[in-house]
Amino acid sequence: PGSVDFRRYHKSGDVLMPLAPSLRRAAAGFLLLAAAAFAGPLIPPPATEAPLASRPGKETAVFAGGCFWGTQAVFQRVKGVLATSAGYSGGEAHTATYRQVVTETTGHAESVQVIYDPSLISYSKLLWVFFSVAHDPTQLNRQGPDVGTSYRSAIFYTNAEQERLAKAYIAQLDAQKAFPKRIVTEVTPLKAFYRAENYHQDYAYYNPDNPYIEVCDRPKIAALKRQFPELFVDYKPKK
């Protein structure tokens, strides 16, 4: 987040400033539109299902779907997810800071690293959640009010199986016309994931009344609970 209409960003000190009253009114009016956007029917599940592992373990997935606050808020409430981190992928290490990423010159996308137990949830189900409630995969280089390549839709795969499943699911959804427009999600190998600054971690949890969270992210969490009740779990950060 950084180029949004609902917040002001203090570029001199990486401080997120409170909203002006006029923006609060705009955010309140937009809330109904945001809620409606995630009230649609559940999209079809992946036809190609990755089987659950026979024993507990840890696997890594990395997704980019606009502002990482909301993407993290969704995946940390999915059963089988062990940990999440907000961060940056797609650019170089020396530009992996919020102040640089919001300039839209680094190649980074705001992304979320998802550590999950493959004996509890499959990569296919994570893809289903990602395309169903975490973001709109038909928006090119933006997500809602956030505009720029750092807000692009992307899947950073960590192995050939993740690449195969992601590409197959996108082809399936396009063929089934699951969305009004074609999916623009990039599927690209993960070169590196750089953890974002601490104040971005668990942001939606610690700032539930921030108008941006109310408008853009609460509807996603509500949609997850409504559309995937068997996967939804309450979340509380570990101390």
Show where each model-derived region lies.
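Flexible coil/turn and secondary-structure edge motifs
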Residues: 18-19, 23, 38-239
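Bacterial N-terminal signal peptides
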Residues: 26-37
